[in-house]
Amino acid sequence: MAKKLVDDLEREGVLKSERVKKALLSVPREEFVMPEYRMMAYEDRPLPLFADATISAPHMVAMMCELIEPRPGMSILEVGTGSGYHAAVCAEAIERRGKVYTVEIVKGLAIYAAQNLERLGYWGVVEVFHSDGKRGLEKFAPYDAIIVTAAAASIPSALVNQLKDGGIMVIPVEEGFGQVLYKVVRRGEKTEKKAVTYVLFVPLR
């Protein structure tokens, strides 16, 4: 089932690199969804978690991972842990060589994600923190990449400031009556911002 999903994403042009393809095949999505949705784990759709959170659709996880240009040794910050699935895919995309720090504002979700990640052997590569992701995670900054998995009203300056020079942030932003996914690259004290596509995420809390 995972292979069919990955083949479909590759055919649709969402999956472009062998690195992200292997990452998606390596992470068992069914282990990160609620029990009642296990049979739907390899459908390309978001699925409900709890506390008004969702696990992102596989095509969106793939797209965001591709946009940060993953490579071994990277330091990645994820804002919005959810069930831990996206963080696990990022860890595989950097071949578990590097670090993924993930921040979740809902304590119950942070605990749930940490349990999932530990059970599947990601402890030591992925670290989960319960805190306000809009402020980033200054302790381990600067980062090669930041992935935000909830829609912000605007691009938080605290997150931009925690990017390395040349670092990439992928973030959905509320615009008008919709949301736009942006790829933001830090260049010294300035940023380059490129709109990627229209998206639909839960709001950043």
From Swiss-Prot:
Keywords: Cytoplasm, Methyltransferase, S-adenosyl-L-methionine, Transferase. CDD domains: AdoMet_MTases. It is an enzyme of class 2 (transferase). InterPro entries: PCMT, SAM-dependent_MTases_sf. GO terms for molecular function: protein-L-isoaspartate (D-aspartate) O-methyltransferase activity. One of its GO terms (biological process) is protein modification process. The active site is at 56. It catalyses: [protein]-L-isoaspartate + S-adenosyl-L-methionine = [protein]-L-isoaspartate alpha-methyl ester + S-adenosyl-L-homocysteine. Its EC number is 2.1.1.77. The keyword Endoplasmic reticulum does not apply. GO terms for cellular component: cytoplasm. SUPFAM superfamilies: S-adenosyl-L-methionine-dependent methyltransferases. It comes from the Archaea. It is found in: Cytoplasm. Belongs to the methyltransferase superfamily. L-isoaspartyl/D-aspartyl protein methyltransferase family. Catalyzes the methyl esterification of L-isoaspartyl residues in peptides and proteins that result from spontaneous decomposition of normal L-aspartyl and L-asparaginyl residues. It plays a role in the repair and/or degradation of damaged proteins. This is Protein-L-isoaspartate O-methyltransferase. The lineage of its organism: Archaea, Thermoproteota, Thermoprotei, Thermoproteales, Thermoproteaceae.
